[in-house]
């Protein structure tokens, strides 16, 4: 156990572990500063944004299945969203892990609903379940998702955003073709494309209504 006495010691610990990571990576023959698979997502995201600039809107994706609460994207089928997840998890094998990519509005309710889904999946399939909010996970575990041995089963959770803010085209300008919600959607799509390109198994569940209610329905169905 490391005892932290003040804010400065916290900074010292961060530096120590950054150095430890670099030293360990050196002896493992790994470049700790290389992130080729993070760049793969950025490349796809830039292409999505460029297409948005040209079209004036994000290109539509056709869902595989449409339910009252959610739309499902991916090569999958099922009678309910919970059934979709069960069918998706039939691919699971020893040594795999599940990853929830959460592109939802963070809140205490959302955290609890996502955590309930994580616990149910971990118990039912006896596999580790990673969970991260997008887009912030992209620069950390996002590298692992596309650069590992391909053991992940990815469930991406998205929603529409009622409140939005424009992103100015350049500093000091009011003109904007991009909003923060569109940027977030582009990042989710870009990572999904990068994962698919890398041969990873992924489905997307897009909540048309309250995602917390949708997650609770899935958990109850599982």
Each model region followed by its residue ranges:
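Phosphate-moiety recognition in structured ligand-binding domains
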Residues: 1-222
């Amino acid at each position: 156990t490391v005892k932290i006495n003040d804010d400065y010691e916290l900074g010292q610990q961060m530096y120590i572990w950054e150095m430890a990571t670099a030293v360990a990576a050196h002896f493992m023959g790994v470049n700790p500063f290389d992130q080729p698979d993070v760049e793969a997502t950025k490349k796809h995201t830039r292409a999505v944004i460029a297409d948005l600039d040209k079209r004036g809107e994000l290109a539509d994706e056709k869902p595989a299945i449409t339910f009252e609460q959610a739309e499902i994207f991916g090569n999958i089928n099922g009678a309910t969203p919970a059934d979709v997840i069960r069918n998706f998890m039939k691919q699971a094998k020893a040594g795999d892990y599940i990853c929830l990519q959460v592109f939802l509005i963070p809140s205490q309710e959302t955290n609890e609903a996502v955590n309930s889904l994580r616990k149910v999946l971990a118990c039912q399939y006896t596999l580790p379940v990673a969970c991260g909010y997008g887009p912030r996970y992209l620069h950390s575990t996002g590298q692992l998702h596309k650069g590992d041995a391909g053991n992940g089963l990815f469930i991406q959770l998205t929603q529409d955003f009622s409140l939005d803010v424009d992103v100015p085209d350049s500093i000091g300008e009011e003109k904007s073709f991009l909003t923060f919600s569109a940027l977030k959607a582009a990042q989710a799509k870009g990572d999904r494309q990068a994962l698919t390109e890398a041969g990873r198994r992924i489905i997307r569940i897009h909540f048309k209504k309250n995602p917390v209610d949708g997650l609770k329905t899935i958990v109850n169905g599982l």
